[in-house]
Amino acid sequence: MPPPPPQRPASSHVGRANLFSASPPPLSNRRYPHHRSLPLPPVSPRRRDPKKHSQQPSQEEPTDSGPTRTVTTNPAFRAAHLRTAYRKPVPPAAAAGEGEALLAADPTDAASGRAVVVGPSGLSFRLPGAPFDFQFSYSEAPRAPPLAIREPAFLPFAPPTMPRPWTGKAPLLTKEEKARRRGVRLHTPLGQETPQTVSAHGIMMEVRERRKMDLARVSPGDGRSREEVLGEPLTPSEVRALVKPHISHNRQLNIGRDGLTHNMLEMIHCHWRRQEICKVRCRGVPTVDMKNLCYHLEEKSGGKVIHRVGGVVFLYRGRHYDPKTRPRYPLMLWKPATPVYPKLIKEAPDGFTKEEADEMRRKGRDLLPICKLAKNGIYITLVKDVRDAFEGSDLVKIDCEGLNPSDYKKIGAKLRDLVPCVLLSFDDEQILMHRGKEWKSRYSKPLTLIPKVPKNNLAMTSVMNSSDEVSDANTQVAIREVLRPKMFKLWKSAVDSSLALLLDDAEANNLTPDSLLTLVEEFSVTSQAVEHSFPALLVTNGDASTDSLSAEYMNDEPETSVAGNEEGQLEQSPDLRDDEHFDVDMFERLESSVPLGSLPIDSMIERLNSE
């Protein structure tokens, strides 16, 4: 490489004149005189002052043999992290959801059975001796197999699993630990002689050290099954006694957008160590599918959901639970990177062309949303509301203004699987859905108040016809839907609960205004009697005795049998995860019904009538 051409000295201020046309050559190496480096080209004084900066190292490689300096860096310092563009596709079988792929960054981990599993359930971590594969989130894992991973296959557990050197500082010793280092016994066991050992510093007393915490410990428990730990089912009175003290208690486990995470299992067992009930408060995305959340709470923790009100779940540990022999799982030291999943929004969704999808998206811009979701709200009825909205329209939009983008995308993915529906757009913080071409109504034929009437009976209709043509007499008027399916369901529930009266065709044809008024008055009395039948405290006067009232109450077979059947059904309910079971308020449940004429107001009326 020829030396650079000489340059003229650059102009400088007074007192700072550049006396050299180029930078002075570096000094020769006294130890290795042959190792000389060529001078670097001069740098403009405007950009860099040579007096304030040191010379750059030599770029010439040594020609003679000499001591070489090898740079060894740990792979953890150049490992991929959240800001690196790491992407590794998973095997085709795992991406198609047909099997699992085992990945391991360290050969020793693969030989010991420690591996990262990529399969239909997402990204999980397998450890030897574990009862199940660990995941970061058990309830919010997508139901689609991942396409690629965003970080190397490292296990997010104990420090020995990651090749990272110790670069921190040892914690300060406490007074007790310093005493242990000096060999001073803090207490002497009764009835035992202290063993002594001789060392270079004199007589040192053996002291039992503190047990070290094993972050990678995996213990499935004492081998008992979940049914053996739970024991016999709880009676309604026991459930009431367990749940009531925790209703207004603030000692609870909060579940947010990530759902039931792995480290929450340890927190649940910490709650169970001091109390039999663990109160779980759910907000946000997991409340869309509370059945799924309750299922994973029971399966992963081993407990039993005995009561649920809205987004609050009460988890029971079991009759034979022992904190000393409980299962122990390692803690995740960091949140693993989320894998790459298929896109939720497609240009041409399943069953539609691109032109049809674009047309539906244009219609959805002017569509009014059926509801607006609040941040960290409770969305228990969202699936039902979307299903009811699809009964009247093929497009449904939900307003998610103010929510995190990842939140309403997770909500859309849940609605796609639970409703089911076809996702069209997430634009403008709105979830736009279509009910799909294979949609079928959940209700029977809608109820109508106008029966089929032959057109020949409607003279006014034929006269008012603009075409002045009378159609065939056998043709009938098309049915006009007076009640929508949702309103029909409300009417049906009102009739079943004796809050509404349904008349057949014969009664409706013979109905007159006077008879209608009489019928309404009779029904109002009956509905009030049904509505106001509730347990009350029986207060009797001196004439009537409590024995006669209790005997009359016990002899009332129909009402007591109905109440007994209702209580038996609640006790023998096999599936406590059903929403209908949890909607029952167990603290205001009707345990019995009072016979007619036994209320205090009835005794007062009888006394006034006799006077």
Curated annotation (Swiss-Prot):
Q: Which organism is it from?
A: Zea mays
Q: What is this protein called?
A: CRS2-associated factor 2, chloroplastic
Query: What are the leading ranks of the lineage?
Result: Eukaryota, Viridiplantae, Streptophyta, Embryophyta, Tracheophyta
Q: Which GO terms describe its biological process?
A: Group II intron splicing; mRNA processing
Pfam families reported in the protein's UniProt record: CRS1_YhbY
InterPro entries, A to Z: CAF1P_plant, RNA-binding_CRM, YhbY-like_sf
Q: Which GO terms describe its cellular component?
A: chloroplast stroma; ribonucleoprotein complex
Spell out the PANTHER family in the cross-references.
CRS2-ASSOCIATED FACTOR 1, CHLOROPLASTIC (PTHR46247), CRS2-ASSOCIATED FACTOR 2, CHLOROPLASTIC (PTHR46247:SF3)
Q: Which Gene3D superfamilies match?
A: YhbY-like
